Design a protein with these regions (language model features):
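Gly/Ser/Thr/Pro-rich low-complexity, intrinsically disordered segments
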Residues: 1-150
Length: 150
C-alpha cells in the first residue's frame, strides 16, 4: 500500500486495498479511509496504508474478525491528531483477535486506530539505559516507523 517517509513516496496508493491510511502532515496525525485518498495526496510527511481499521470516531469498527489470535501492531490517534501512539502486543503470547484489539483501543481512548500487521512481523526496539531493547522477531519487515519525542 501507500507509504510516504519524510515527504518522499516509497509506494503508491493502492485504491483497491481496503482499510485505511495513516497520514501525518503539519504535526497532526489522522486516519482516513483508503478509498477517500487522492492518487497523490499533497503535503504528507508520513503515510502508511494498511488494514483493517480498528477504531473510527472513537467507536469499534464493525465487522472485525472475532477469531484468529496473533501478535499485533497498531497505531492510535488521540487529542485531535496531536498524539500518535504505537501499540504492540507481546509477540511471545497468542495475542488478541482484531475485534478484541479494536475494543481495547476504543476503551483506551483512541479516536481512530489502524492495525499495521501481526504475527512474526510484530516487533519494536527502543534505546534504554542498558542499550537497545528489542521485542519480537521482526521478520519480513519492508518498512519500519521511527518515533522521536517532541
Amino acid at each position: 500500500g501507500y507509504v510516504v517517509s519524510q515527504g518522499v513516496q516509497l509506494s503508491p496508493v493502492r485504491p483497491k486495498l481496503d482499510g485505511a491510511t495513516l497520514l501525518v502532515s503539519e504535526a497532526r496525525a489522522r486516519i482516513v479511509r483508503s478509498a477517500q485518498l487522492p492518487r497523490t495526496p499533497a503535503g504528507v510527511e508520513l503515510a502508511v496504508q494498511c488494514k483493517p481499521r480498528l477504531v473510527e470516531a472513537g467507536k469499534l469498527v464493525s465487522g472485525l474478525k472475532p477469531e484468529g489470535r496473533a501478535a499485533r501492531t497498531a497505531l492510535c490517534v488521540r487529542d485531535a491528531g496531536r498524539t500518535l501512539d504505537a501499540y504492540l502486543t507481546d509477540p511471545a503470547e497468542r495475542g488478541p483477535t482484531l475485534a478484541e484489539l479494536g475494543s481495547w483501543l476504543a476503551a483506551d481512548g483512541c479516536s481512530d486506530a489502524l492495525n499495521l500487521d501481526g504475527g512474526p512481523s510484530t516487533a519494536a526496539a527502543y534505546r534504554g539505559e542498558a542499550g537497545v531493547l528489542r521485542i519480537g522477531p521482526g521478520e519480513f519487515l519492508p518498512y519500519s516507523i521511527r518515533f522521536w519525542p517532541r
